[in-house]
Amino acid sequence: MTAGTLEDLGGRWRLRFTREIAHPQEKVWRAITEPEHMRAWFPQDVSGQWVVGGPLVFSGPEGRGPDFDGEVLAYQPQSLVEFRWGTDVIRLELAGRPDGCTLTLLDTFDEVGKAARDAAGWHECLDRLTDDLDKGELSFQPGQRWAEVHPRYVAAFGLEASALGPPPGA
């Protein structure tokens, strides 16, 4: 298990996940930025263009939460995309390695009480991403990984960071 960490930014909070992925950076870039590939792992459908300042719309497939507006905050092809997703700021960074690439996901938010819930969600999302890249299908049921790892994040982050329960669909 590659667990995420929680950082106190003095009024804001950040979840950090780093995954070593044994696929070429270009392939992973497509998986994290192209809507038809994002459906395999991201919690909502995404529409819009990856242009700094451009609007994004996030819609909830399969009952996975409410719709959100967003905005592209930073974009560097093949290496970085950052966007506002509701009130959160999501940053995805890719760095090439000889045997694949390193993906870093950062989620910056205001309410510490959702940290364990969202960490378990991102953990499942990243497992879905690697399953899709490796096999083209999931090796677990949606929500299953969330249920497995959520207690670990509650224990790691504490009760203050565990005020909210599972998201829709978990």
Language-model-derived ranges and their functions:
Residues 26-30, 114:
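Short, conserved charged micro-motifs
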Residues 1-8, 94:
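Short amphipathic beta-strand and strand-loop transition segments with alternating hydrophobic
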Residues 10, 16-17, 23, 27, ...:
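Short beta-edge strand/loop motif at the mouth of beta-sheet-based domains
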Residues 31-32, 75:
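Conserved catalytic core of Hanks-type protein kinase domains
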Residues 109-170:
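A conserved amphipathic terminal alpha-helix motif
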Residues 11, 18, 112-115:
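Active-site oxyanion-binding pockets that recognize sulfate/phosphate
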Residues 73, 80-133:
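Beta-strand/loop substructures that line and gate deep hydrophobic ligand-binding cavities in soluble
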Residues 56-58, 65-67, 98-100, 166-170:
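Charge-dense, helix-prone N-terminal extensions
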